[in-house]
Amino acid sequence: MSLGIMTIKETILKYGKNEKNTGKTDVQIALLTNQINHLQLHFSQHKKDHCSRRGLLKMVSKRRKLLNYLKKKNISCYTKLIESLNLRR
């Protein structure tokens, strides 16, 4: 279950300002959110796929840690990102 290359590049350009800025916290959170949304669609069809569910939980945990880091470092960027990704926090 992977995202398309174009989807990844568009996300990187939207949140990282250029295609090589993949390490920015905003970009990492946006990419994880896209992967999580993609996996949620997968689980609507494959309810017993427990191995992938473990990967999903790891992604959610990593995104939560990155969001906590961003909240500590830059609260304005954090609030903009939460609104643009439609996350509840």
Swiss-Prot record:
InterPro entries: Ribosomal_uS15 (IPR000589), Ribosomal_uS15_bac-type (IPR005290), uS15_NS1_RNA-bd_sf (IPR009068). Signal peptide: none annotated. The keyword rRNA-binding applies. The keyword RNA-binding applies. CDD domains: Ribosomal_S15p_S13e. Keywords: Ribonucleoprotein, Ribosomal protein, RNA-binding, rRNA-binding. Part of the 30S ribosomal subunit. Forms a bridge to the 50S subunit in the 70S ribosome, contacting the 23S rRNA. Belongs to the universal ribosomal protein uS15 family. This is Small ribosomal subunit protein uS15. It comes from Buchnera aphidicola subsp. Schizaphis graminum (strain Sg). The lineage of its organism: Bacteria, Pseudomonadati, Pseudomonadota, Gammaproteobacteria, Enterobacterales.
